[in-house]
Structures are given as structure tokens and as C-alpha cells.
Amino acid sequence: MNDHTYDVAILGAGIAGSALAVMLARHGVSTLLIDAGTHPRFSIGESTVPVTTLLWRGMAERFDVPELNHLAGFEHVRENISSACGIKKNFGFLYHHRG
């Protein structure tokens, strides 16, 4: 049994929970990251739109976590994380009208 006390517990090790955990830990916050699933698996955030790269770059700089730049663009993901990925052109919806 682990008797360690954590400052923060994050439920969900998806892209948002993992990013938050690394940002907090980088700044000295004792962080516990908990997830019910196992990887690899599809998860929300696995597909993002290009504008998201600006957010990753901003968080990398603001919170001094340069590793987040690995998520800031298709070429960075393929080079630093996995070559088993592609580019999602857009998220969109189709509307069907009678007639």
C-alpha cells in the first residue's frame, strides 16, 4: 500500500489529463494520474484540428513544458511520438434536408 499523500489527483490519462499532470508536476505539485483503461486505445483528443497546435505551443511556453511542443503539429507527432498517425482535415457535420 502506498501511504504517499498527493497534492492533486487527476482522473483520466487522456490527452487533457496527461498534459495537466505533466504541467503540474513540472512545477512541483505532487500529482497522481489515474485511468481505468489501458493503452493503446482510441481516445478523445487523438484527433485534433490544426488550430490546436497553437494551444499546445502556448501551453508549452507558458508552463515551461517544452515536451508539449511534440504535440504541436503533425510533423512533430510523427517524429517524436508515433509514425502511426495521420492528418485529420477537419471535423464537420452533414445536414440532410428532405427533398
Where are these regions (language model features)?
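Beta1/beta-strand and adjacent pyrophosphate-binding region of the FAD-binding site
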Residues: N2-A16, L32
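A structure-centric signal for secondary-structure junctions around beta-strands
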Residues: T5, G28, K88-N90
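Glycine-rich FAD pyrophosphate-binding loop
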Residues: A9, A25-E46
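Short secondary-structure boundary/capping segments within folded domains
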Residues: A13, M23, I81-C85
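Conserved Rossmann-like nucleotide-cofactor binding loop
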Residues: A16, L20, H39
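A short, Lys/Arg-enriched amphipathic alpha-helix followed by its capping loop at the start of a domain
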Residues: L20-V29, L55
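N-terminal FAD cofactor-binding segment of flavoenzymes
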Residues: R41-R98
